């Protein structure tokens, strides 16, 4: 038995196919979703979506949003998403280093909040590059 997973951003469909299982980062922690999961709606945190397909794990960086699960259908609506395999490792590492520097030099509450969010997004992209084996 499988689940139908759709990952959507405001600009595109990132994923729309059947999967065996997912692990989703929510605001209250990670949750695993298998076929016949109880219906839920949850906020999606900045983090990694792990997808099991054909007994292999794939990763996707999600940048926060909302998910609805029910009747073996999972719809994830997020601000942005990138498949781990599509992320350039060198560019992601440079972005992470820049984000870390920006956190250190941020002044004022707003700058600190924005710098910390950018750092979380950069860390998530770097983490998505290395899928689970």
Swiss-Prot record:
Transmembrane segments: none annotated. One of its GO terms (molecular function) is proton-transporting ATP synthase activity, rotational mechanism. InterPro entries: ATP_synth_F1_dsu/esu, ATP_synth_F1_dsu/esu_N, ATP_synth_F1_esu_C, ATPsynth_dsu/esu_N. CDD domains: F1-ATPase_delta. Gene3D superfamilies: 6.10.140.480, F0F1 ATP synthase delta/epsilon subunit, N-terminal (2.60.15.10). It is a peripheral membrane protein. Its main location: plastid. It comes from the Eukaryota. The keyword RNA-binding does not apply. GO terms for cellular component: chloroplast thylakoid membrane; proton-transporting ATP synthase complex. Keywords: ATP synthesis, CF(1), Chloroplast, Hydrogen ion transport, Ion transport, Membrane, Plastid, Thylakoid, Transport. It is found in: Plastid, Chloroplast thylakoid membrane. The keyword Transport applies. NCBIfam families: ATP_synt_epsi. HAMAP family: ATP_synth_epsil_bac (MF_00530). Produces ATP from ADP in the presence of a proton gradient across the membrane. F-type ATPases have 2 components, CF(1) - the catalytic core - and CF(0) - the membrane proton channel. CF(1) has five subunits: alpha(3), beta(3), gamma(1), delta(1), epsilon(1). CF(0) has three main subunits: a, b and c. Belongs to the ATPase epsilon chain family. PANTHER family: ATP SYNTHASE DELTA/EPSILON CHAIN, ATP SYNTHASE EPSILON CHAIN, CHLOROPLASTIC. This is ATP synthase epsilon chain, chloroplastic. It comes from Nicotiana tabacum (Common tobacco).
